[in-house]
């Protein structure tokens, strides 16, 4: 196939799509250029599904090569290793709008690999990767109901910005990524500076409108490439099996969905499934039916039973009304030795969230393609298998945990103090101890409380809520504070976090087309009412940050010295700074601009370290009297240390008003003596006198 190129203007960037020259053995491959940021995105689809495959094995891997930024990886191994957090998050960002566009019965393995091969540090690879994945899948001839477009939206001075650069985002009140087809929004991921619901919805519709040019270009590309449509045909439904199953189940599932407790409901449904499969076992054998298909169709019955029930009765499977939030319980300060903690329970979803305060050196150093930087606010989300009553793998965080942690972090970022306002590294850990839907939003609520319990000066409390949707034709219901089953069996997962003032984070995943702007508007308004209710419940535990830090949290003292004096504080080979930290038990960080941060759980020790540094950096003043220690005896006099790192000479003629024949007769090393500074010459040499003090001259150094 000859090389095909398509170029278009997208915001401030020139975007080029190329296919037919590179990676020609992949099912679909495209090079995406967004100015100087260049990605190769490939899609490969297996010709057939594996035997017994009962799920759609789609994998997406986004990777940033260090050579893209002209760098060699740091550390011992000089090659890229496992996926970074950013790579994992962008991989999920690509997966989410693509997965629902494949047919439900399609089980062939599909793999998308997006490789960043050149990176302009001001143009991120996320939007280019989404566009490339859409184009590669469209070229692959899979039964992909795309293409999709993607756009990043900023907001500044009341105006939306299409595909802002990283520099522009620093001053933007919004960073929102939206992806979807020509007719529908499928995915939204965003963080915002407490914006209104109207501004957030406007950003979604703005991005969806602008991305149409991407969809049109991809359609043109596939036509020119001569891509043949997929020949895959969905397997025919076994109507006899479905009829037999419905007859065997009867109204049992409807009854099971009236059980309000999650675990009891799960057990009731499992018992019905077991009985039905056993009752139909003979017919399955005689008719040659597939037991896997029978199990799948049972799941379809579950899906329709729950949906039909809530659409008809407007009552949910746990008995709540559509807009009712589950009962909430909150406690702050639940763990005695931590710096800040909270227990947040909402129905059958529960999180223990802990805040830890550290110094600047505790920040995480990130070795990224665009350059090394330090992260001083860390948010980690853990989802152990016991939280859903199961056994499972326990260890390194999975992609889902990284994604949920990032969403929860976005939820509280807008209210966090700057490093200048609160010079601590802050780590928040959310341990999900129970889960029945919306655990990431429970993490937002719990983290807000734990941060305030730790005394972090957040601007306002933050709460989060997950919304759902069930839609059949023109009938639809919007659900507040969804359960796990409502998420799994519903059409939308719509998470909103924010304060009473506005939205700080919005994440949306939609499984169907036909979600109108009016439906999204209703969901946002219903979410706001739920968020305000949750904030009211949270206020029963804490309304503002505690005034005092925990007794176990480090106290920070900050002093400023002239940058030229940094070497004096450090000392030869680090001897001075090491002596101070060892003797006072403190941790000391020195920045290039002369800012010194002293950290210690003991306030007295921190003050002692501060005094030592002030002594070292203070200038020796002629005419002042200091108390010093004799450091060395010489024939012509004695050297006396008057300040740390500062020695002066007492000449033999200045030791006493009487004649001194031998210095050792009057002074010994280690003696404490009071001396007056006679002179500090241009070379910094200090002349001292003991005689002048005895004669009553000079002003004590302590007299300020």
From Swiss-Prot:
CDD domains: KH-I_PNPase, RNase_PH_PNPase_1, RNase_PH_PNPase_2, S1_PNPase. This is Polyribonucleotide nucleotidyltransferase. Component of the RNA degradosome, which is a multiprotein complex involved in RNA processing and mRNA degradation. Its EC number is 2.7.7.8. Its cofactor is Mg(2+). Residues 623-691 form the S1 motif domain. Keywords: Cytoplasm, Magnesium, Metal-binding, Nucleotidyltransferase, RNA-binding, Transferase. GO terms for molecular function: 3'-5'-RNA exonuclease activity; magnesium ion binding; polyribonucleotide nucleotidyltransferase activity; RNA binding. Mg(2+) binds at residues 487, 493. One of its GO terms (biological process) is RNA processing. Involved in mRNA degradation. Catalyzes the phosphorolysis of single-stranded polyribonucleotides processively in the 3'- to 5'-direction. It comes from the Bacteria. It comes from Xanthomonas campestris pv. campestris (strain ATCC 33913 / DSM 3586 / NCPPB 528 / LMG 568 / P 25). It is found in: Cytoplasm. SMART domains: KH, S1. Belongs to the polyribonucleotide nucleotidyltransferase family. PANTHER family: POLYRIBONUCLEOTIDE NUCLEOTIDYLTRANSFERASE, POLYRIBONUCLEOTIDE NUCLEOTIDYLTRANSFERASE 1, MITOCHONDRIAL. Gene3D superfamilies: GHMP Kinase, N-terminal domain, K Homology domain, type 1, Nucleic acid-binding proteins. It catalyses: RNA(n+1) + phosphate = RNA(n) + a ribonucleoside 5'-diphosphate.
